[in-house]
Each structure stands twice: as structure tokens, then as C-alpha cells.
Amino acid sequence: MSTKKTFEERLQELEAIVTRLENGDVPLEEAISEFQKGMVLSKDLQKTLQSAEKTLVKVMQADGTELEMDA
């Protein structure tokens, strides 16, 4: 059974990919594959952050008006 990884788990995976690529000891084919995987993770993480931001923007103040947050 496949469960979706948490934001933190996906971020950790992206950080590990970046570290491996920065070290430069990855064969070219693997580096390309890791780069592509990293780009997918990056886009997914960005979507998660944007969704969280939209949720936070809708937080209501005590008087019932929406709290505006700078993007």
C-alpha cells in the first residue's frame, strides 16, 4: 500500500538529491535522473506551500474579517 510522503519527508528527499548532485560523484545518467526527480519534488513542494498559504490567508480574525497576509 502506497502512502503519500509528508512535506518534510519530500523536502528531506530533495535535500539529499541536491547534496548528491553537488558532490559531483554521480554518473551522468544517474545525475540526469536525479535532477528530474528533484524538479518533480520541487514543484510538488511548491504546490503544497502555495496551498498552505491560501489556507492561512483565509484565517479569520476575531471580528470575522479575513486576515490579509503579504505574499
UniProtKB/Swiss-Prot annotation:
It comes from the Bacteria. It is an enzyme of class 3 (hydrolase). The keyword Isomerase does not apply. GO terms for biological process: DNA catabolic process. Keywords: Cytoplasm, Exonuclease, Hydrolase, Nuclease. GO terms for cellular component: cytosol; exodeoxyribonuclease VII complex. It catalyses: Exonucleolytic cleavage in either 5'- to 3'- or 3'- to 5'-direction to yield nucleoside 5'-phosphates. It is found in: Cytoplasm. Its EC number is 3.1.11.6. Gene3D superfamilies: Exonuclease VII, small subunit (1.10.287.1040). GO terms for molecular function: exodeoxyribonuclease VII activity. Signal peptide: none annotated. SUPFAM superfamilies: XseB-like. It holds the Pfam family Exonuc_VII_S. Belongs to the XseB family. NCBIfam families: PRK00977.1-2 (NF002138), xseB (TIGR01280). Heterooligomer composed of large and small subunits. Bidirectionally degrades single-stranded DNA into large acid-insoluble oligonucleotides, which are then degraded further into small acid-soluble oligonucleotides. This is Exodeoxyribonuclease 7 small subunit.
